[in-house]
C-alpha cells in the first residue's frame, strides 16, 4: 500500500467493493483524486447507504447489523452517521441488549458501556431509539439480519403497540443481499 503522504493528484486510487468512509473520500479529494472515477463499490452496499440516508431524512435512527471492525461496516457507519444517529450490533445477543434499552429495562449508561465505540457521536438512547430502521453489512447472513430486524420490531411493538409501531419501525428488508 502507498502511504498517504506519497499520493498525488496523478495517482489512481481504486475504491473496493465494500466502499470507503466519507472521511477517506474527502481526504482523496483534498489531494486532487476524484474517488468516484475508480469506484468499485458494490451496488448493494450503495443501496444500504441510500436507505440509511432516507431513514435519516425521515428522522429514523439506524441499527447496522455488522462487524464493527469490518471495512464495509466502517464505510456504512460513516455514511449513515452523516444523516442519522447510528449503532452497530454484531449478533442477536447484542440486539437483545439493545431491545432491553428500548424497553427501559437497561439504562442509557448501560447502553454506552455495552456499545462503547459502536454508536455515533451524540447518540442519545432515550430519544434515538424511538424511531429505528435496521440495515446490514451485506456480507452478513441475510437470515440473521432478518432475525435482528424482527427482534427490534417486536421490541418496538411491545413499547408502542401493534397499531402504532409503523411510526417507530422502518421496514428495510429490501437492503438484504442474498
Would you name each region that the model predicts?
Residues 1-178:
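The feature marks the mature, well-folded catalytic cores of soluble enzymes
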